UniProtKB/Swiss-Prot annotation:
Protein name: Photosystem I assembly protein Ycf3
PROSITE patterns, A to Z: TPR (PS50005), TPR_REGION (PS50293)
Compartments where found: Plastid, Chloroplast thylakoid membrane
SMART domains: TPR (SM00028)
HAMAP family in the cross-refs: Ycf3 (MF_00439)
Protein's organism: Dioscorea elephantipes (Elephant's foot yam)
TPR repeat placement: 35-70, 74-107, 122-155
Gene behind the chain: ycf3
Keywords, sorted A to Z: Chloroplast, Membrane, Photosynthesis, Plastid, Repeat, Thylakoid, TPR repeat
Membrane topology: Peripheral membrane protein
Organism placement in taxonomy: Eukaryota, Viridiplantae, Streptophyta, Embryophyta, Tracheophyta
InterPro entries attached to this UniProt entry: PSI_Ycf3_assembly (IPR022818), TPR-like_helical_dom_sf (IPR011990), TPR_rpt (IPR019734), Ycf3/AcsC/BcsC/TPR_MFPF (IPR051685)
Main subcellular location of this protein, as a coarse class: plastid
Free-text function comment from the UniProt entry: Essential for the assembly of the photosystem I (PSI) complex. May act as a chaperone-like factor to guide the assembly of the PSI subunits.
A GO CC term attached to the entry: chloroplast thylakoid membrane
Length: 172
């Protein structure tokens, strides 16, 4: 087994142990514990990282039924969006990213992922010969990237450069 895989397994196991200890000692309601358990099983227990998207989605959906904190819920919804993105289900992914941002408007990675999807749709429209639709998708991508960059200046360098090159950058 390669060293990186051994280290990864060690980190996963350590994270699981720490999460279990915290779950026992931090005062939480039974609903919060249940939500965290589903979240942990969906994310920390490697279902998502191993490509078991159906299992991870099931755990995330269960977590959304139990989690009431908007901030925590935003990350669960964001992770559901990630899985739908990985599966090529871009419309569903956008829906979950929107829901995540509604609960936590300071989630630059959700804005970035929405921009990437819009940019991809713009590229597809170009291949179909529909430049007007492509421009609309690119304009939307630009808006999302501006929001992501505004939240985390210095990140998303490639997006920043694309905004400059395409003359869609209005701030600076």
């Amino acid at each position: 087994m390669p060293r990186s895989q051994i280290n990864g397994n060690f980190i996963d196991k350590t994270s699981s142990i720490v999460a279990n200890i915290l779950l026992r000692i931090i005062p939480t309601t039974s609903g919060e514990k249940k939500a965290f358990t589903y979240y942990r099983d969906g994310a920390i227990m490697s279902a998502q990282s191993e490509g078991n998207y159906a299992e991870a989605l099931q755990n995330y959906y269960e977590a959304t039924r139990s989690e009431i904190d908007p901030y925590d819920r935003s990350y669960i919804l964001y992770n559901i969006g990630l899985i739908h993105t990985s599966n090529g289900e871009h419309t569903k992914a956008l829906e979950y990213y929107f829901q995540a941002i509604e609960r936590n408007p300071f989630l630059p990675q959700a804005f970035n992922n929405m921009a990437v999807i819009c940019h991809y749709q713009g590229e597809r429209a170009i291949l179909r010969g529909d430049s007007e639709i492509a421009e609309a998708w690119f304009d939307q991508a630009a808006e999302y990237w501006k929001q992501a960059i505004g939240l985390t200046p210095g990140n998303y360098i490639e997006a920043h450069n694309w905004l400059k090159i395409t003359r869609r950058l209005e701030f600076e």
